[in-house]
Amino acid sequence: MTDNSNIRVVVGMSGGVDSSVTALLLKEQGYDVIGVFMKNWDDTDEFGVCTATEDYKDVAAVADQIGIPYYSVNFEKEYWDRVFEYFLAEYRAGRTPNPDVMCNKEIKFKAFLDYAMTLGADYVATGHYAQVTRDENGIVHMLRGADNNKDQTYFLSQLSQEQLQKTLFPLGHLQKPEVRRIAEEAGLATAKKKDSTGICFIGEKNFKDFLGQYLPAQPGRMMTVDGRDMGEHAGLMYYTIGQRGGLGIGGQHGGDNKPWFVVGKDLSKNILYVGQGFYHDSLMSTSLTASEIHFTRDMPNEFKLECTAKFRYRQPDSKVKVYVKGNQARVVFDDLQRAITPGQAVVFYNEQECLGGGMIDQAYRDDKICQYI
């Protein structure tokens, strides 16, 4: 058995079951393990209750159970500057941001990694469902997690080779039920704790109310693509491309009783475009452009790639051709794609390997910009 006792791994512990089992497995494998809780947001509610305090208590309980030291580090300023400001700027621009991608890139694998190095870390580890493997040249490849339902490579697609070189994902080969079972068999304090969902800084709060605290809503007209007025929208930032609920128009405008969907936004005129039918023509596109293109290892400045891609989390892969130039790319789909959403991540795969990705700027139908921003 390999002696890992001289290898220090600093584990990002959230107070959830996944990061708890991550720390446990590394400890069992003989590593020198330290647990660190990141406080990224002041989430004290109107009753003075802070969920981060409860989560930190869970981290402390688990760390004590498995016998590792633990610390808390405050990244509220870094999170505000690098993630939350981006989140607001994207909504101001009428886009739908993906703060999880930015949080991994800027906080969990940058601010946290830097902090871990001050603790003498050889590696950091998190409870993400992804895998890393090293080839004979020492290049690290990131592979999908074995649990298809939980694979999180979509959110990790902006990680660099330097970040991946320093990262372990001990849960990558496990299915989620196995992780729960390991926690229960070890009697961990978090074994039965439910998974957190949604955006960390919103938590259980109403999204509309939350966003309205930071950005003034600007109501405007809701129109069909052919110019029919369908009433008022509450503010473009509250709607995303392909959204069905929350439009308040139902079937009262005649037609064929098909459900209504958001099919586009005109930011300059503050118009929300809606259309009937899941596969409404305005929702379908043949290609997209993306920026902030990034690969997990060094690539030429300009090249063409045939691979598969995801345009949202948990979506089946689609075959694409990618034309890369610097940090920009044009992605052409083999088949029509629905509801390509500016602001979301496009992520590239070669079978099991996550190659990298970028942020969607615009969708196209042939060479015509779709009815979006």
From Swiss-Prot:
Pfam families: tRNA_Me_trans, tRNA_Me_trans_C, tRNA_Me_trans_M. The keyword Iron-sulfur does not apply. The keyword Transferase applies. One of its GO terms (biological process) is tRNA wobble position uridine thiolation. Disulfide bonds join C103-C200. It catalyses: S-sulfanyl-L-cysteinyl-[protein] + uridine(34) in tRNA + AH2 + ATP = 2-thiouridine(34) in tRNA + L-cysteinyl-[protein] + A + AMP + diphosphate + H(+). GO terms for cellular component: cytoplasm. Residues 98-100 are annotated as: Interaction with target base in tRNA. Keywords: ATP-binding, Cytoplasm, Disulfide bond, Nucleotide-binding, RNA-binding, Transferase, tRNA processing, tRNA-binding. It is found in: Cytoplasm. Its EC number is 2.8.1.13. This is tRNA-specific 2-thiouridylase MnmA. It comes from Streptococcus agalactiae serotype Ia (strain ATCC 27591 / A909 / CDC SS700).
